[in-house]
């Protein structure tokens, strides 16, 4: 779990929304994910990215909705995922979006 947390950053992320009903039995991993993403260290990587906790009392399935700056959306249904699986998937999508965003852009080379 520590390795997944070390790779966490919100640089290419536009918004994170975590939705869950606290009275359901399968929300522990989603709450752990919310705690990890809401930490001061992770939040400081992108101060313009809101992390929204949508707590409902309607028996709804726990869900994490991540919107990236390039319009890509990652939706994770937390009912049957562990916190480690969610954090690992989130970190791998962040790396992929970072690589796609900072890829070979014309004019990116400033050396003369």
From Swiss-Prot:
Highest taxon, organism lineage: Eukaryota
Annotated TM spans: none
GO cellular component: mitochondrial large ribosomal subunit
The UniProt record lists the keyword Ribonucleoprotein: yes
Cell compartments where the protein resides: Mitochondrion
Keywords linked to the UniProt accession: Mitochondrion, Ribonucleoprotein, Ribosomal protein, Transit peptide
Annotated family: Belongs to the mitochondrion-specific ribosomal protein mL53 family.
Subunit-structure text: Component of the mitochondrial ribosome large subunit (39S) which comprises a 16S rRNA and about 50 distinct proteins.
Name assigned to this protein: Large ribosomal subunit protein mL53
Organism from which the protein derives: Pongo abelii
């Amino acid at each position: 779990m520590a390795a997944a947390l070390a790779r966490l950053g919100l640089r290419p992320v536009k918004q994170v929304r975590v939705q869950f009903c606290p009275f359901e039995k399968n929300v522990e991993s989603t709450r752990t994910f919310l705690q990890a993403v809401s930490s001061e260290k992770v939040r400081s990587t992108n101060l313009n990215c809101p992390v929204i906790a949508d707590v409902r009392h309607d028996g709804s399935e726990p869900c994490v909705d991540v919107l990236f700056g390039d319009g890509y959306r990652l939706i994770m249904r937390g009912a049957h995922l562990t916190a480690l699986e969610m954090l690992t998937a989130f970190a791998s999508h962040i790396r992929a979006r970072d690589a796609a965003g900072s890829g070979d852009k014309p004019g990116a080379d400033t050396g003369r």
